[in-house]
């Protein structure tokens, strides 16, 4: 009898761990197979762009905004009504959501659920949900009605959480409802007017007059323009902040080797953040270090990409990842690479190189099916481009590729990242 009771208790324990009990922390919309409560529904998708949706800096504030502030549909990279076409290329559409949570359990899983009214399907279609920088991908079929994303322990955090949705390889997906499920103790809180998303010391120094300083990087996502009062030790700074997502460099005074500073940030008479930091000597940042080499590389053409080109150089080295068509070159949305071409001119390319391992393949494969050829998936998190330098990890081959170029030649270094 005792053995039976122990077995029953053990069985219940296993069930509770395999099928954890979730409660709804936040929900947007009703699960009624209808999108009528969302913005632009039922057929206003042509106003998606002019309504400001799709901008990765236009945030939806969970717990404050309503379904009427969130679009009923998310377009994929080939949706013409959202800016894509044969001539214009792909569009990069993202729907960012900001959620402020309290009593987050770092040892428990959470769930992001998406209920779907309709799918306008294309091959290899999937929806990505990025949670605080961690990507979760879920494939979509023509009859998919629900997507469940299991968020691992420790990904969601106390305070502000950034969740971004992006549709890949498809026309569109129409929402029925969206919800976050998790432990019962976790609660959603109001965002506030000036959320301080993060504070950290920069990994560089700036010139400040005749001295150098290591700036504090302050990231905010604000509803409206305003003023922050920043106190660093005894010094007070008043900083004007703009609407939307921005990163500000806050000077921290003359740097003397390693030193500790205490930072307190206030707005409208209320303290919103306090933290201590250790300053240390870093390299001086130059003006060219602010250049974003990826700017304009989505929905663009062959002449715009993250390659390390010399001005008026004969060699124009750049990663190529698009299938053959009139504007093919580099597209930021594509997460694999066909190789690195040395020529990018009007209707002309050439001398493509890519390091590989394993069996010999003579076809490149396609954007959607890289395994059909010698293409390699890449790690977008570590892809780096700055003036005169490009680096990417070819994850299918465990090779890091580094590129630079002179006026008439390229220099490439391939490093095996997994010697086994």
Please state what every model-predicted region is.
Residues 1-21:
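Bacterial Sec-dependent N-terminal signal peptides
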Residues 22-107, 115-187, 241-253:
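Beta-strand-rich ligand-recognition modules
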Residues 91-96, 107-113, 203-218:
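Contiguous beta-strand segments within globular domains
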Residues 108-110, 123-127, 224-228, 261:
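Short beta-strand/loop motifs in extracellular/secreted proteins, especially
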Residues 171-172, 268-274:
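Short, exposed coil/turn segments at beta-strand boundaries within extracellular/luminal domains
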Residues 181-211:
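Short, compositionally biased P/S/T/A/G/V-rich stretches that sit at domain boundaries
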Residues 207-215, 221-225, 254-266, 275-420:
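Accessory carbohydrate-recognition regions in carbohydrate-active enzymes
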């Amino acid at each position: 009898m005792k053995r039976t009771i122990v077995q029953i208790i053990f069985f219940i324990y296993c069930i509770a761990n395999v099928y954890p009990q979730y409660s709804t922390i936040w929900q947007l919309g009703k699960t009624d197979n209808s999108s009528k409560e969302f913005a632009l529904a039922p057929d206003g998708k042509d106003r998606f762009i002019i309504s400001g949706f799709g901008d990765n800096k236009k945030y939806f504030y969970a717990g404050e905004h309503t379904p009427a502030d969130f679009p009923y549909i998310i377009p994929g990279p080939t949706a013409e009504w959202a800016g894509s076409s044969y001539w214009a290329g792909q569009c990069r559409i993202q729907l960012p959501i900001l959620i402020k949570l309290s009593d987050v359990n770092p040892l428990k899983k959470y769930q992001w659920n998406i209920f779907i009214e309709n799918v306008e399907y294309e091959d290899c279609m999937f929806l990505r949900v990025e949670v605080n920088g961690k990507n979760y991908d879920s494939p979509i079929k023509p009859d998919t009605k629900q997507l469940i994303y299991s968020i691992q322990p420790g990904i969601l955090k106390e305070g502000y959480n950034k969740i971004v949705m992006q549709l890949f390889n498809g026309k569109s997906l129409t929402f029925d409802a969206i919800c976050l499920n998790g432990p019962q103790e976790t609660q959603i809180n109001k965002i506030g007017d000036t959320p301080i998303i993060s504070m950290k010391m920069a990994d560089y120094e700036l010139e400040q007059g005749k001295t150098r300083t290591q700036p504090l990087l302050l990231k905010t996502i604000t509803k409206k323009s305003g003023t922050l009062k920043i106190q660093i030790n005894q010094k007070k700074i008043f900083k004007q902040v703009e609407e939307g997502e921005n990163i500000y460099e806050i000077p921290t005074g003359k740097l003397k080797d390693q030193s500790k500073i205490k930072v307190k940030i206030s707005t409208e008479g209320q303290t919103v953040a306090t933290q201590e930091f250790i300053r240390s000597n870093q390299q001086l940042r130059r003006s060219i270090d602010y250049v974003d080499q990826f700017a304009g590389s989505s929905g663009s053409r062959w002449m715009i990409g993250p390659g390390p080109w010399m001005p008026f150089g004969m060699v124009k080295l750049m990663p190529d990842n698009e299938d053959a068509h009139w504007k093919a070159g580099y597209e930021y949305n594509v997460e694999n690479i066909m190789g690195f071409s040395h020529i990018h001119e009007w209707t002309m390319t050439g001398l493509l190189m890519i390091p590989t391992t394993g069996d010999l393949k003579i076809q490149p494969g396609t954007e959607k099916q890289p395994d059909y050829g010698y293409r390699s998936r890449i790690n977008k998190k570590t892809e780096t481009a700055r003036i005169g330098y490009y680096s990417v990890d070819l994850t299918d081959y465990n090779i890091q590729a580094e590129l630079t170029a002179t006026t008439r030649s390229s220099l490439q270094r391939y490093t095996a990242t997994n010697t086994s």
